[in-house]
């Protein structure tokens, strides 16, 4: 899925650009969380249409787990609208649920990566306030 944006210059200057913590997925969610933190409203225009020129392709299970679990967890940890401890607790539970759902230990491996990133996540959360 791709996002198509209409953002004022003022909002872009106040909220900032995409975070470098998100190499590809999760940027849009993180930016919207930060915009809400700064008092901006985020909306969807159901009648708007845009085309994202991307061919459908099957993805390996590992890539789906990475995108759905790891990037989703990273978005949650970076949400400056809620305390980090609350987000971390949520991600701990989310890890267990996803491991059972996928029948895989990959969420636990990704969880370790997220724990190692906590200092950088704390720094990013502070920088975007």
Model-derived segments and their meaning:
Residues 16, 35-36, 55, 60, ...:
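Short, function-defining helix-loop hinge/capping sites that tune catalysis or transport
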Residues 33, 75-76:
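Active-site phosphate/pyrophosphate- and oxyanion-stabilizing loops and adjacent acidic/basic residues
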């Amino acid at each position: 899925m791709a996002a198509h944006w209409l953002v004022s210059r003022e909002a872009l200057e106040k909220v900032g650009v995409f975070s470098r913590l998100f190499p590809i997925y999760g940027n849009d969610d993180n930016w919207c969380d930060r915009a809400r933190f700064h008092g901006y409203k985020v909306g969807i225009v159901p009648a708007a249409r845009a085309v994202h020129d991307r061919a459908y392709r099957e993805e390996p299970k590992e890539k789906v787990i990475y995108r759905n679990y790891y990037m989703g967890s990273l978005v949650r940890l970076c949400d400056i609208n809620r305390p980090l401890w609350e987000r971390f607790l949520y991600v701990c539970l989310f890890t267990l649920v996803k491991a059972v759902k996928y029948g895989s230990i990959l969420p636990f491996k990704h969880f370790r990566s997220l724990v190692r990133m906590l200092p950088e996540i704390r720094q990013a959360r502070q920088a975007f306030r």
